[in-house]
Regions:
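Solvent-exposed, charged amphipathic helical/linker segments at domain boundaries
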Residues: 116-131
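Hydrophobic alpha-helical connector segments
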Residues: 79-109, 133-139
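C-terminal peripheral helix-coil segments that are non-catalytic and often amphipathic
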Residues: 140-233
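Alpha-helical structural segments
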Residues: 13, 17-24, 59-79, 94-101, ...
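Secondary-structure edge/capping motif, primarily at the C-terminal ends of alpha-helices
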Residues: 76-84, 117, 204-208
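Basic, helix-initiating cap at the start of DNA-binding domains
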Residues: 1-29, 33-38, 42, 55-62, ...
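Long, contiguous binding/interaction regions
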Residues: 113
Length: 233
């Protein structure tokens, strides 16, 4: 059995405490409230001492984003795993619902991850180029479930010629699908579905639907049903 050295355990605990306090500040006051100085004060540290753990505020925000993406991914995967493994469409549907539930319950965290550009987040997301990035890990279960639906039902998609003509120069199916081998028209359907899901959830989280509906969940369920119907045709 490998025993973690005491110094390493203490450092890991301190890093976790710093990120926990950063999240508390985020929830209390949004991204501008996250401050290395405020965290150091709450921990009884000097401001320079905190730089032994994070070289900059951007680095801390990027690390916090990684934790949040992993937390959201685990939430979505739990919803997926509660459905039978041989029913990919219900699994994808429950994943979409789980994404909405987490997002609505964590508006500040959602805002940091998916909202207005914040330097640390912008830099972090710019590095999302491989499957090991937390943002890619979050998207992977959705892509896998979507691919399973496609391989099971071969749902209708726009003509490949149309997609090639309109998006051929701007889309990289292999990169988007992380090597899943999906044809370009299916990758387009995946992107279309994701932007539809994300757009509605973002409008709800940021309070932009109050002019139209008093309760967003029924609208979400109607949109989700319409999306599912497209893949069931």
């Amino acid at each position: 059995m490998t025993i973690t050295p005491r110094r390493e355990r203490i450092r890991s605990a301190t890093v976790a405490e710093i990120k926990n306090l950063a999240r508390q500040l985020l929830v209390a006051g949004g991204p501008p409230a996250i401050s290395l100085r405020a965290i150091a004060r709450d921990m009884g540290m000097t401001a320079p001492a905190i730089y032994r753990y994070f070289p900059s505020l951007d680095a801390l925000v990027g690390d916090l984003c990684e934790d949040l993406f992993d937390e959201l991914r685990e939430w979505v995967e739990a919803a997926r795993d509660a459905c039978p493994a041989d029913e990919p469409l219900p699994r994808l549907t429950e994943m979409a619902r789980a994404f909405r539930r987490w997002s609505v319950a964590h508006p500040a965290e959602f805002g940091l991850m998916f909202g207005s550009p914040v330097p640390g987040v912008t830099r972090y997301e710019a590095d999302c180029v491989g499957p090991d990035h937390a943002g890619a890990r979050f998207g992977a279960p959705f892509l896998q479930a979507f691919a399973e639906v496609w391989h099971t039902s071969r749902f209708p998609t726009p003509p490949v010629e149309l997609i090639e003509q309109k998006l051929g120069r701007y889309i990289a199916p292999h990169e988007v699908s992380h090597g899943a081998g999906l044809p370009v028209e299916v990758v387009y359907a995946y992107l279309s579905g994701w932007t539809r899901l994300y757009g509605l959830v973002a409008m709800e989280v940021f309070g932009h639907l109050g002019w139209a509906v008093t309760e967003v969940e029924p609208l979400f369920e109607l949109e989700l049903a319409a999306f599912v119907a497209q893949m069931s045709a």
